[in-house]
């Protein structure tokens, strides 16, 4: 089953699940995780013993230990705390600014601030290990997908997460583009599709044209704050308000109750995709402070009521679809197929709105949870030389430019420009005898610099003094195939190049990334030792059970002195099972049991 130098494809999910796939021959195969599931919840939890749980084991702890369990971390990756203040209020763990003002998580059991990149790395490491178990060989490289609307900082942070997990991220790719590849657009002739990607935390729409081994992205649009989690929040808010009306208690103040409400809301949403009504039943949700008696939450929610709650959210997705169509200069009737991606597309109202808008049923032949990872695996196959003849032309989601005199944003690369791309413009000084200029790199659609997202700042110094307008400064923007931006500036006046290369930082320095990698390695060693100790104790427990059973069955056939000695060994083993922290202690005791028969048929001596 092994293949030389396999590159895996990973869909690093946000609110819900992550998926890993790999090319096996001509087919993209989704790999099961260690629990036997094809979907791995993007959840990480820290125990009191500082053990790190990932996936289903972590998700099961979310209600019991909400402060130490992180979900939805992708919402915070590569973001400043000030940007995510409101979102931070909606999770059960503490989101705080680190020393640089970046969003981080204050996890008591971790004993430190945990960065979103570290959480992503734990999930990626689990997927990497699942792939290694499946392939029977080490995996060192991966293609990872991100929402099309992720900015450069968020993309770099995702690459850093891969590095921490021990993966070389050979390509960062837009999720809708991967879905088009899994759909087989490159195999069709002159087809135009629209990918409607409604996931747990983000919404993206891309319009692509394909044929003869080429996939070209014509337009992309989206919202990184619109997804299934927003639907869950609407249900949660309804439950909270209904409970408050009935009992006068605001459940927002109770972190454990909030986590239970979140899980119940998500489950209700899923059930209403195939049922007309569901009952939400949360016994012992809180205690009445006046009577000190437990209170229960029990509510019926109909599909019609849910659709009323979320109608405006689905309409927002259609508005974004309209924007993408306008950018691509096409009409709804020009779209040959609408491909659905993301678990939220299972909602009947979503499918109904798409059908009404396009006048046709959306394509439902692909599993919306797995399609992105499969597309990533196909791209990984292209990079590994296993899949031939696919040319991909992706685009930039937002305008990129610099701040110029008067606080204006001057655009160098317009929205929906195919990448990779390199563009430059020549600027001059604003003041007489100016010897340095500030290059302020911006990302956004607004005309004024202050209204757009600041990506980077640097100074070009050593400009010979001259009247304003004389020096000529060339600024070059270069976006690579990963969508990562590099900026260079040089003084053309002297003929001598002075350049500064700016690579967008995720907020982590190389030293910090190395420290996190080292910590992860140390944690992995600790986890391995803990696992080995547990296995040794389990083996000891089995030996105790076996010897007790043998002694009982043998009865009077066992000499009194041998029985007394055996019981002493059993007692010591039981204490060791309870208290031992050293594996050698358990292993040494295992040797004692080899002196006794494993069956009453064998003689005791």
UniProtKB/Swiss-Prot annotation:
**Sequence positions bearing Phosphothreonine:** 202
Q: What induces it?
A: By stress conditions e.g. heat shock.
Q: Which InterPro entries match?
A: ATPase_NBD, Chaperone_DnaK, Heat_shock_70_CS, HSP70_C_sf, HSP70_peptide-bd_sf, Hsp_70_fam
Query: A Gene Ontology MF term for this entry?
Result: ATP binding
Which key words are in the record?
Answer: ATP-binding, Chaperone, Nucleotide-binding, Phosphoprotein, Stress response
Q: What does this protein do?
A: Acts as a chaperone.
Q: Which NCBIfam families match?
A: PRK00290.1, prok_dnaK
Q: What family name appears in the similarity comment?
A: Belongs to the heat shock protein 70 family.
Record protein name field: Chaperone protein DnaK
């Amino acid at each position: 089953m092994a293949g030389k130098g396999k590159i895996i494809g990973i869909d690093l999910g946000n609110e819900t699940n992550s998926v890993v796939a790999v090319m096996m021959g001509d087919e993209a195969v989704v790999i099961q995780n260690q629990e036997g599931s094809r979907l791995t919840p993007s959840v990480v939890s820290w125990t009191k013993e500082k053990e790190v749980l990932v996936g289903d084991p972590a998700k099961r702890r979310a209600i019991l230990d909400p402060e130490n369990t992180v979900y939805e971390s992708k919402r915070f990756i590569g973001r400043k705390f000030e940007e995510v203040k409101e979102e931070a209020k909606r999770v059960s763990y503490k989101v705080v600014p680190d020393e640089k003002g970046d969003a981080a998580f204050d996890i008591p059991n971790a004993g430190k601030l945990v960065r979103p990149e570290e959480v992503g790395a734990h999930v990626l490491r689990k997927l990497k290990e699942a792939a290694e178990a499946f392939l029977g060989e080490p995996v060192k490289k991966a293609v990872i997908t991100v929402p099309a609307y992720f900015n450069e900082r968020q993309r770099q942070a995702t690459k850093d997460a891969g590095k921490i997990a021990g993966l070389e991220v050979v390509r960062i790719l837009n999720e809708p583009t991967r879905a088009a590849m899994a759909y087989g657009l490159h195999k069709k002739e002159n087809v135009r599709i629209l990918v409607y990607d409604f996931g747990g935390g983000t919404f993206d729409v891309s319009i692509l044209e394909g044929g003869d081994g080429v996939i070209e992205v014509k337009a992309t649009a989206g919202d990184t704050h619109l997804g299934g989690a927003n639907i869950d929040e609407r249900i949660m808010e309804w439950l909270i308000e209904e409970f408050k009306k009935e009992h006068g208690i605001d459940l927002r103040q109770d972190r454990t109750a909030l986590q239970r409400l979140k899980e119940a809301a998500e489950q209700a949403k899923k059930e209403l995709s195939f049922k007309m009504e569901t009952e939400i039943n949360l016994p012992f949700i809180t205690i009445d402070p006046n009577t000190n008696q437990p209170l229960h939450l029990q509510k019926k929610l109909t599909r019609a009521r849910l659709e009323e709650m979320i109608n405006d959210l689905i309409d927002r997705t259609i508005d974004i679809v309209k924007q993408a169509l306008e950018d691509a200069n096409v009409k709804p009737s020009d779209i040959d197929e609408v491909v659905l991606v993301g678990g939220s597309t299972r909602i009947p109202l979503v499918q109904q709105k798409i059908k009404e808008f396009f006048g046709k049923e959306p394509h439902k032949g692909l599993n919306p949870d797995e399609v992105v990872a499969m597309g990533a695996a196909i791209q990984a196959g292209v990079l590994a030389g296993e899949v031939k003849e696919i040319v991909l032309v992706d685009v930039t989601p937002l305008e990129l430019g610099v701040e110029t005199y008067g606080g204006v944003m001057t655009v160098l690369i317009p929205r929906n420009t195919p990448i990779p791309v390199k563009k430059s413009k020549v600027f001059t000084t604003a003041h007489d005898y100016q010897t340095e200029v500030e290059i302020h790199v911006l990302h956004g659609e607004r005309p004024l610099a202050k209204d757009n997202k600041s990506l980077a700042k640097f100074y070009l110094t050593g400009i010979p003094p001259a009247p304003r307008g004389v020096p000529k400064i060339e600024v070059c923007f270069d976006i690579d195939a990963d969508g990562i931006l590099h900026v260079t500036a040089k003084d053309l006046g002297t003929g001598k190049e002075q350049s500064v290369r700016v690579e967008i930082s995720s907020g982590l320095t190389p030293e910090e990334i190395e420290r996190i990698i080292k910590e992860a390695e140390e944690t992995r060693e600790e986890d391995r030792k803990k696992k080995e100790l547990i296995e040794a104790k389990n083996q000891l427990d089995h030996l105790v059970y076996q010897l007790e059973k043998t002694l009982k069955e043998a009865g009077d056939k066992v000499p009194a002195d041998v029985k007394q000695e055996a019981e002493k060994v059993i007692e010591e083993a039981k204490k060791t099972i309870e208290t031992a922290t050293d594996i050698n202690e358990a292993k040494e005791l295992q040797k004692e049991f080899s002196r006794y028969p494993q069956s009453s048929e064998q003689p005791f001596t």
